[in-house]
């Protein structure tokens, strides 16, 4: 198990890497997972290290854009489906509800959107009910928020007496979509997925390369971080293929990467993501009418 002290050294970017190198000098304990952290590729943006800067992309709203209804699905929280458990032992359903509420508040503050969080957390909510609710409400886009788990899993102790899963090898976001069904609706889903990934990358977030997705999702040739559902037909994601409006699923980050999970608790990251979402929705919905 990796101690919190050793991992924190690895979270601090270049300074942390130097400190971790000293900690791993000959004669001192050598933790294999901690050593691997030194070899992680660092994206030009530096994400997900603490010093990496995030920015708020500017949204361009065309004349007549009006106020658009956006249904925000806080992923999981369905009967018997709590989602993953993060590197801080937080259930995915708790993270997604918090993230969806934060996004709704920020989108609504623009005056350009009426964003609604479909799940309140008071009871497990089946996905079919969410899709029906979005249609009844007249949502123009369905955005499902999640976190992902990838790669080889170690364990660490973020607090005394607690053991949580950890994996530092595959940070980044992914935007999933489905080409199943009506081709015109599929084209609108793809446009929405590409707009979100493009604007999230512009905000300074890292698109995931997809190494762990082989056989599950196929990468988009035009936009990094976008993947189409290629699971067996009976296992494909319900909220990507059933809504009558364009729908996407955003794997916001790698829940087992302590650097990235920490960044997603920061107001600056939530602000940048909300700005990217507003810009993406303006891009994708602004040309429709």
What feature does the model see in each segment?
Residues 1-289:
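Catalytic-site microenvironment of enzymes
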